[in-house]
């Protein structure tokens, strides 16, 4: 069977790393991005610049590929649905529709007996005042929030002005007494067919991932519960490809699912060097119908995100043999922008 030509929507670092993994497997990639300077132009076999909602651009893209995947979840559902009518989209657009909304995402998790933080839907200021048991809490937009965007910490009901715009739809989540954050990256190939990575421990600054390490420090009980919950999510979604479930552990060692990322995940970047098969290669293998190989951890590892001007001190640095530097080749350095990462393995 010949290998498919793979279309990837999105030209950021995740698209770049997916394209690099595909090249290793001799799979041609065509990337569609609405950013003419997207870094993935340096990694894809072919690059198309254009509006995701321009039907002519979409048709040109689809003529060049056999199937489509994507690097980020905030693509409008209707766009993915239209594409899926012409060429197969994996993971399914229906999954994206569910996960794009924090309220339906949490309802899905709870329906499958997966514990989340306490939450309530918020439509106006009165809703916050009525639901003060969720304070202190985080007020989040139901859609389009990432890396801390669209989030507001609420310490009391008077923190918001009367003119605050609630039209986007919000969810208020009670803040847990946080001990640590972890993530579980899993690739599902089909019914009960998985490759799953052990939990990764994560540390954030300004609500942006700063560094990660594998293995995470935790009890076997919590580890196994997190792995089981991640598998349940993938199975119940009928997911194909790599995805991630982010978790909180509180100071009483209770586990809470925070959110689902229906794509490869920033915390999983270290798998490029820590494992024989990375999260990116497993995603390509799953969506392209290639053989599932046993994924093994070879090294413990730590990953440091290089954010904004952090990248500048690493560009001409000499690295040790156990250090691996990745420059995303973004044209412009911006504050709070992920510019690259450094992975250190323990030999």
Report each predicted region and the residues it spans.
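ATP-binding N-terminal substructure of ATP-dependent carboxylate-amine bond-forming enzymes
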Residues: 1-100, 104
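Peripheral (often C-terminal) accessory segments that flank ATP-dependent C-N-forming ligase machineries
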Residues: 2, 285-347
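Short, hydrophobic beta-strand segments that form beta-sheet elements in well-ordered domains
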Residues: 8, 28-33, 68-71, 120-121, ...
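Active-site nucleotide/adenylate-binding loops and adjacent lid/helix of ATP-dependent enzymes
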Residues: 98-183, 187-233
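Short acidic-glycine loop/turn motifs at beta-strand connectors
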Residues: 188-193, 250-253, 346-347
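Protein kinase-like catalytic core scaffold
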Residues: 195, 243, 255-259
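Active-site "cap" helix and flanking loop/linker of ATP-utilizing ligase/carboxylase catalytic domains
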Residues: 224-245, 251, 261-309
């Amino acid at each position: 069977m010949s290998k498919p030509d793979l279309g990837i929507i999105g030209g950021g670092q995740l698209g770049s790393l997916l394209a690099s993994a595909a090249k290793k497997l001799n799979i041609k990639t065509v990337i569609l991005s609405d950013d003419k300077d997207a870094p993935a132009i340096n990694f894809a076999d072919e690059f198309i610049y254009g509006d995701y909602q321009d039907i002519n651009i979409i048709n040109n893209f689809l003529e060049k590929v056999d199937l489509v995947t994507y690097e980020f979840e905030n693509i409008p559902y209707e766009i993915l649905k239209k594409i899926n009518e012409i060429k197969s989209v994996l993971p399914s657009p229906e999954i994206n529709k569910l996960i794009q909304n924090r309220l339906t995402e949490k309802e899905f998790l709870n329906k499958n007996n997966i514990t989340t933080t306490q939450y309530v839907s918020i439509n106006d200021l009165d809703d916050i005042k009525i639901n003060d048991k969720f304070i202190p809490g985080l007020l989040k937009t139901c859609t389009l929030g990432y890396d801390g965007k669209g989030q507001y910490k609420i310490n009391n009901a008077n923190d918001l002005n009367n003119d605050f715009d609630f039209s986007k739809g919000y969810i208020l989540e009670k803040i847990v007494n946080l001990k640590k954050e972890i993530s579980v990256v899993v690739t599902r190939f089909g019914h009960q067919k998985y490759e799953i990575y052990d939990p990764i421990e994560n540390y954030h600054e300004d609500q942006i991932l700063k560094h990660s390490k594998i293995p995470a420090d935790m009890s076997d009980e919590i580890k196994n519960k997190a792995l089981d919950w991640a598998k349940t999510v993938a199975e119940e979604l009928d997911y194909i490809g790599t995805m991630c479930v982010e978790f909180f552990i509180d100071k009483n060692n209770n586990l809470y699912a925070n959110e689902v990322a229906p794509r490869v995940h920033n915390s999983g970047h270290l798998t490029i060097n820590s494992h024989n098969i990375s999260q990116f290669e497993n995603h390509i293998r799953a969506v392209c119908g290639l053989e599932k190989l046993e994924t093994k951890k070879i090294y413990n590892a730590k990953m440091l995100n290089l954010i904004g001007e952090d990248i500048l001190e690493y560009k001409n640095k000499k690295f040790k043999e156990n250090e691996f530097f990745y420059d995303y080749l973004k044209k412009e350095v911006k504050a709070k922008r992920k510019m690259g990462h450094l992975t250190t393995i323990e030999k």
